[in-house]
Amino acid sequence: VTAPSALRTSSSRSSSSRTSRRRGPVRTRSLAALAITSALVLTGCSDTGAGGDQLQVVENPERASAAPSPATTEDPAGRVVPAGGDVTDLAATDGTLAAALAGEDAVHLHDLDDPGAAPRTVRLPGEAGSLRTVDGTIVATMPDAKAFARIDVATGTAEVVEVDGVPTGVAADGDRTLVALRDAKAVQVLDADDSPVRTVRDDLYSADDVLVAGGGAVVLDQLRTAVFSLDLADHTIGEGLRAGQGAADATTDEYGRVLVTDARNGALLAFDTDPLLLRQRQPVPGGAYGVAYDAKRHVAWVTLTERNEVVGYDVRGGQPEEKFRLPTVRQPDSVTVDEQTSQVVIGSAAEEGIQVITP
């Protein structure tokens, strides 16, 4: 195993490069400087037992999990409808909510105009893991089946694609599909016909998610609690940045950034992707876990499992500004936003239903 390279701060990149690739509104210099000086850009070997990897937080790394929730003390905001089990993930598109439940080989489709109505059920060849909206289509990973499914919410049908590993995240890059394979510590690239083109597998402990934003692709490694740039031209894993002490959930915003929750330290991190650079770190005490983005309001929604709350931050400026703080169902591990209606939907991982909020 090659020893990790020496530490380099992000400020080693030229300021002109950062300016030319920056997207979205101007951010304050003081916050950007803090982020640049506090973030370390490293590469590391892929042996989890190696002691010299400076991105490794502990000797035997484990993925961060949601903090347990107490009993609720306030009525949840908005409307709560039965889910039929523990909600493990949510995604929404065109006024339709997709919900995955623990232990079910299916995804349930709810009409957000009438969330209390009986949902449609889309059967799958394996238990649904993560859900994501990709180019207007709901995509469900099925780790046990080594496959993912594209779900047409209009017809309630699923197109299943098998992959060479355990999929935990899917993203689109033009006409290519990127699939994070947790067990293979790799990202598989599929062409427009879903045929494998290449598998990129360098310097990861675990490939838990893959995201595309701002002209760049990023891999989330939850074991190492770090994000890594993915060079699709050279088919390599590039530089990495630590994402707090317990990277948990991730999404993207319209400013070309990847937003990551740090479940152990209680924070929301914002990374530019090209080049990979930490731009913002917002403390979010109370058990930060799930994250979703509302492009119409420019608000990042973060669930707080220790408090049974969801908090919304306006992320247009140099520092996130709190705009909303609302009570939720117990154990609010998952959250999504429907871009058509701007409704915020939260799932209880404690069998206490699905919460629909119109802020």
List each language-model region with its residue ranges.
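Bacterial N-terminal signal peptides that target proteins for export
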Residues: A3-A32
